[in-house]
């Protein structure tokens, strides 16, 4: 009862703040950037779209132009407003709770999505558009944004995890990359890399839990079960953390990641200088190479993750954004039809690749001609990108995201990785059990 009182008190205060600030879907004064598409068309219906990722607007701008050409009798004027991450999610949740001020369409990041599924979701289900084609998608990505059989969010990418290999280093070490099928093979290859090149096989992040999370998902484990119970200290998770520890201190083929995470400037420079033979991250990390590690162009090769055992899964689905239609829209049919056009159709999934460089969740387009056309990604990584994705498309487990997922991520960065990998004061089992107790105590408050 106390928690509910505090929550609704908080909502009440924040609604007052929003009203005082003029927060409304009809006002873009607080937006970092506002784009209006279709305002030159007489009689166009206005739809308001909120996002926290400016690059996502590019996809919707293109979709509006195409929509208005294809459906001149149902023209759309899209007002796309980009806000800071926390501000957008907080304002959207409060607008939905209060019953007014929400946009027609909105992006919701995967770790925040559970907050919008509490109680009766104030979002409109997209089943009429999703169910006829879901067999053509990586279904696990839709499950992230679903509740009780209703699909509320439309995914933006698969986020398939892969291994990025530096071919130059691997060739110097005499390692055949395609011979690496399991993590045991990976360790043996790493020993050869260290011995023959003096470089490390990989680095282990201490300020980002995603690289470990993808390995956990590969094993069929998770940090929460389907009922929202915390499962941080399972034997599988303990063994994954032990494996990361062993890469550094037992096998001596890895180092702690410079800067703590694969998005740090220190890491970009270290990787760009050719000091690391491989790294595991989702396919969307390709853009980080292009933007921050230009000297590796033509040297990197993408392959499936090594499996934990022969025949095991070789990928995981990490990160994501679900786009929704809110129940406050005055144009339900148009908003849902447009969202399906912009993110579910074949053409839309081709645009996710050509405009954003994302691996589209609709796998049946991956061998379409547009995916074979030369671009910066193929020049950087070679021509096998979608061959790899097609190879692993059925090897991606669903993951369970909770409103407490940010607490898990924070616990890894502040305590678990510090105690196990940096300071080496706790075993993986001790650190994970301690974190389990800490987070469970917070969940019960």
Curated annotation (Swiss-Prot):
Lipid bilayer topology: Lipid-anchor
Cell location: Cell membrane
Lipid-carrying residues in chain (N-palmitoyl cysteine): 21
Family: Belongs to the bacterial solute-binding protein 1 family.
Name of protein: Arabinooligosaccharide-binding protein
Alphabetical list of Pfam families matching this protein: SBP_bac_1 (PF01547)
Range of residues in the leader sequence: 1-20
Presence of the UniProt keyword Membrane in the record: yes
PROSITE patterns found in the cross-reference section: PROKAR_LIPOPROTEIN
Main function: Part of the ABC transporter complex AraNPQ involved in the uptake of arabinooligosaccharides. AraN captures the substrate and delivers it to the two transmembrane components.
Subunit annotation: The complex is composed of two ATP-binding proteins (MsmX), two transmembrane proteins (AraP and AraQ) and a solute-binding protein (AraN).
Lipid-anchored residues (S-diacylglycerol cysteine): 21
Gene Ontology annotations for the cellular component aspect, listed alphabetically: plasma membrane
Keywords from the UniProt entry: Cell membrane, Lipoprotein, Membrane, Palmitate, Signal, Sugar transport, Transport
Main location: membrane
């Amino acid at each position: 009862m106390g928690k509910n009182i505090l929550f609704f008190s908080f909502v009440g205060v924040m609604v007052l703040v929003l009203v005082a600030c003029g927060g409304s879907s009809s006002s873009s004064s607080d937006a970092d950037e506002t784009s209006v598409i279709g305002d030159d068309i007489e009689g166009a219906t206005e739809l308001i779209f909120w996002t926290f990722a400016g690059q996502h607007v590019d996809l919707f701008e293109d979709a509006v132009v195409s929509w208005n050409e294809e459906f001149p009798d149902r023209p759309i004027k899209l007002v796309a407003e980009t806000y800071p991450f926390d501000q957008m999610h907080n304002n959207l949740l409060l607008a939905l709770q209060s019953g007014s001020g929400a946009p027609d369409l909105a992006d919701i990041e995967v770790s925040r999505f559970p907050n919008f599924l509490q109680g009766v979701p104030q979002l409109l289900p997209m089943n009429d558009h999703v169910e006829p084609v879901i067999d053509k998608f990586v279904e696990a990505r839709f499950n992230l944004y679903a509740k009780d059989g209703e699909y509320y969010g439309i995914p933006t990418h698969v986020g398939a995890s892969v291994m990025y290999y530096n071919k130059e280093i691997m060739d110097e070490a005499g390692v055949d990359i395609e011979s690496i099928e399991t993590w045991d093979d990976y360790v043996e290859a790493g020993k050869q890399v260290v011995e023959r090149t003096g470089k490390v096989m990989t680095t282990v992040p201490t300020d980002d839990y995603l690289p470990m999370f993808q390995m956990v998902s590969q094993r069929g484990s998770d940090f929460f079960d389907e009922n929202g119970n915390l499962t941080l200290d399972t034997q599988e998770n303990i063994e994954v953390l032990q494996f990361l520890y062993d890469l550094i201190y037992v096998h001596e083929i890895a180092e702690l990641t410079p800067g703590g995470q694969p998005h740090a400037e220190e890491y970009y420079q270290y990787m760009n200088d050719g000091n690391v033979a491989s790294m595991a991250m989702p396919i969307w990390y390709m853009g980080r190479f292009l933007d921050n590690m230009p000297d590796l162009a033509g040297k990197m090769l993408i392959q499936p993750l090594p499996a934990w055992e022969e025949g095991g899964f070789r990928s995981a689905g990490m990160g994501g954004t679900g786009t929704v239609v809110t129940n406050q829209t005055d144009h339900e049919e148009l908003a849902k039809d447009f969202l399906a056009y912009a993110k579910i159709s074949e053409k839309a999934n081709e645009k996710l690749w050509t405009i954003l460089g994302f691996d589209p969740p609709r796998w049946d387009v991956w061998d379409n001609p547009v995916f074979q056309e030369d671009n910066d990604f193929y020049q950087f990584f070679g021509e096998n990108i979608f061959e790899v994705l097609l190879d692993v498309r059925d090897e991606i487990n669903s993951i369970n995201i909770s409103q407490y997922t940010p607490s898990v991520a924070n616990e890894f960065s502040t305590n678990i990785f510090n105690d196990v990998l940096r300071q080496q004061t706790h075993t993986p089992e001790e650190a994970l059990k301690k974190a389990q107790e800490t987070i469970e105590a917070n969940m019960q408050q």
